[in-house]
Amino acid sequence: MELVWGDVLLKVLFFIPNLAHGGAERVLVNLVNHMDYDKFDITVQTMFDVGIYRDKLNKQVRYIGGFPWYFKGNTLVYKLFTPKQLYKMYVKEEYDVIVSYLEGPSARVVSGCTNSKTKLVNWMHIELENEAYATHVFRNMAEAE
């Protein structure tokens, strides 16, 4: 799929578990803070509305926070729902591009997108070839693939 924006801003969603401390979270904030706002309409959405980097986002970047607190065992709760159900629970708008930032829960949510016009990207920081790790978040390896 070729993405062309012309006179229209390309709507991009970066979906990440949270903006707590960590290198990946900081890299995401730096990335979106340096994107061309004349070409991209950028939204950062978190599963959990926690983290020290929320206030570091530029004013041009829209932020959507998820649950107000992080709860232990959330991956087990998320396994009760299909990716499509999770996607509908979190993502309320249409986007041209959705970037699942970090492997795991955010990738599972974004994989539930059924809009064929949306380009899906998974920003990985590890390899998911390890079945034990993959099934920690996904129901099984088939769902992880």
Would you name each region that the model predicts?
Residues 50-51, 106-110:
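Short, well-ordered alpha-helical microsegments
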Residues 72-97:
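An amphipathic, basic-hydrophobic alpha-helix
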Residues 116-120:
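A short helix->loop->beta-strand "cap" motif at the edges of active sites that frequently abuts
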